[in-house]
Amino acid sequence: MNARHTLCTVLTLLTVGCSQQSAPKLEPLKLGDGRTIAAETLERGRDVYLYYCRSCHGDKGNGLGPSAVGMRPVPRNFQQGLFKFGGVAVGELPTDAALGRTLRRGLHGTPMLAWDVPPADVEAVVQYLKTFNPRWREEKPGTPVEVSADPWKGREAEAVERGKAVYHVAGAGHAGCSGCHIAYVSRPELEALTLQVTGRKVDFSKGDLYTALARDSDYAVEVDEKGEPTRTAKVLPPDFLQHRLRTVWPLGDEVEDADYTPERQREDLYRVIAAGVGGAAMPTWKGAIPEENLWALTYYVQTLVNLRDTREGRALKERLLSPAK
């Protein structure tokens, strides 16, 4: 248990007792998907929330708990009803499975830790989170984005080459991720890829292809007395050679009591690329580009992710940033 984990637990233990003693009875919650969550489940979820979550996310689920000061990224404000990693298309409510996965795994590279909580408590607190925003009473969760069969098995090198083009070129069934994230090829390479995919000659000699710009998001960092956002967070698209991805772990780590294999890593990458990132500039790519291109993109991004903190990755970064790129 690290120092922040210990501090959060201590703060919770110092404050949770009084809140539990005075906590009012809860009414059953009728959800937009037709289910009704029993009051007993919600009250159990509240107990779990107060014990594990309150110190960061606050009594009211607004992300303003006593431990939240100075945290980056800031704790999620559940009152907004927005979730980045919901396992569904952008803009839809997340599935219970996706919320539970985040609770069990945490978010890599953030103060959101993996919590070793019994499954019944995970289920209960997932339902309790739905009391913070009326969307849950009015809408159904989105359709889960399923991980399809990998069409590139046994052809990994070919997939990476295809994925490089899918990443860097926009149009013709390609995603053009380098428009928000940075490019990882030289300017001449990018011009050649663009000509190959689109048949168009484009001059990339001007402009900064290797610095990402922070993008607007829907996530509040300041609210007024009514809880309405007055300022929202800027989100920097990750540089895969430098930044940790929230729902993807380094190979060899143990995630949910199992070794994190290349296959598991690839599935997690596919899931977030396919679904997109809710409330941010990252769109849903499932259905927007051909499935074989979506998987090829996954393979290519995986190679970049695994170059992070390596000599080869640093050398690539230096080549891209050199004057003769």
Give names to the regions the model predicted.
Residues 1-7:
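Bacterial N-terminal signal peptides that target proteins for export
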Residues 14-17:
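C-terminal motif of bacterial Sec signal peptides marking the signal peptidase cleavage site
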Residues 19, 56-63, 104-105, 113-117, ...:
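Detector for the c-type heme attachment site
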Residues 22-48, 137-172, 187-189, 308-317:
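Electrostatic cytochrome c docking/interface patches
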Residues 38-58, 153-183, 190-205, 269, ...:
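Sequence/structural segment immediately N-terminal to covalent heme-attachment motifs in c-type
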Residues 49-55, 60, 74, 111, ...:
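Short pre-active-site segment immediately N-terminal to redox-active cysteine/selenocysteine motifs
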Residues 58, 65-69, 90, 112-115, ...:
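Short, solvent-exposed loop/turn and secondary-structure capping segments
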Residues 70-116, 123-129, 194-284, 294-297, ...:
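Extracytoplasmic electron-transfer domains, predominantly the class I c-type cytochrome c fold
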